[in-house]
Amino acid sequence: MSPCENDPPINWKRNLIVAWLGCFLTGAAFSLVMPFLPLYVEQLGVTGHSALNMWSGIVFSITFLFSAIASPFWGGLADRKGRKLMLLRSALGMGIVMVLMGLAQNIWQFLILRALLGLLGGFVPNANALIATQVPRNKSGWALGTLSTGGVSGALLGPMAGGLLADSYGLRPVFFITASVLILCFFVTLFCIREKFQPVSKKEMLHMREVVTSLKNPKLVLSLFVTTLIIQVATGSIAPILTLYVRELAGNVSNVAFISGMIASVPGVAALLSAPRLGKLGDRIGPEKILITALIFSVLLLIPMSYVQTPLQLGILRFLLGAADGALLPAVQTLLVYNSSNQIAGRIFSYNQSFRDIGNVTGPLMGAAISANYGFRAVFLVTAGVVLFNAVYSWNSLRRRRIPQVSN
């Protein structure tokens, strides 16, 4: 009998609350610096419109690129050493990097630190893996849906707080404040998260081929990874053109930035409301039904976005789209839980994070390229086509299987 087996049972609901708080803090920390990132790039000596645009895009994207590369390594280490340790590593590492960002003297230092931020990240996928391995399987949809709202809440609050702090104290102090938030996350995780984990030696670890063979349906798991990528591509493709599209719809108004900010935020608000409820519904009727329905609903909302005539119409459609999006990633994660074992949960969720990061990089590039060649409205139609392909692909993958019966 291992020492862990003598410990009292873990209160997974308490861990869920603490993990939610950790995801909220890291989501807020990441988005705090987003509103003024181009301004900081300019402050570091980059001048000229084209150079500023190029460097802003590079320093934004490089974090996701290096996160995609590093996630599988951290996932494997989580399966060997425990998920709590990876949460602590991520929060502390990102906190230190944020301090160094506030001290950067030129664009190359900042670029390297943004890459390092991606390498040391991984709080959210490891939080997902931790909760997925502790929660009763018939509550996975609700738990993972609830957990997803933590990061969304932080990402909604972060830009507003970051903009206010930058206006009040300047750009560099915001990095130090962000570091403080991440250090707080470190201590909350250290003292409040509980995990019973028996470390696994490197020799006992399943190798990649064994991980694949241990999956109940490897092709389905791969299709879920692809679904995650396409979800992020669809979300990111609209980001580069949203403000310009709103300006085109609004005409000659003075508060176009405020209107754009509102329209950018409403999907997150809708996702906050929908994710736990649709996750709970998925536990009852099956997450695969939620996934396919939400994908089809997304297609039906993206198409009319190409034909709207006012910002209000766009805002309403974006709100409804956010409600559908709030169900997508939790449904994918729940299906990953159903089709993998706790022994490899860290790697499975980290692979999924890698696909998500690739989508975060490619989505804005796709949106910018389409809008440059065919106009803003074409972006919504092409994105709808991509999501429709994903719906058909996911349905084809899911129809060959049944969700196994789950129990407490």
From Swiss-Prot:
Belongs to the major facilitator superfamily. DHA1 family. MdtG (TC 2.A.1.2.20) subfamily. The gene is mdtG. One of its GO terms (molecular function) is transmembrane transporter activity. This is Multidrug resistance protein MdtG. NCBIfam families: PRK09874.1. One of its GO terms (cellular component) is plasma membrane. GO terms for biological process: response to antibiotic. SUPFAM superfamilies: MFS general substrate transporter (SSF103473). It comes from Escherichia coli O7:K1 (strain IAI39 / ExPEC). Keywords: Antibiotic resistance, Cell inner membrane, Cell membrane, Membrane, Transmembrane, Transmembrane helix, Transport. It holds the Pfam family MFS_1. It is a multi-pass membrane protein. It is found in: Cell inner membrane. The chain crosses the membrane at residues 16-36, 58-78, 92-112, 115-135, 146-166, 173-193, 224-244, 256-276, 290-310, 319-339, 378-398.
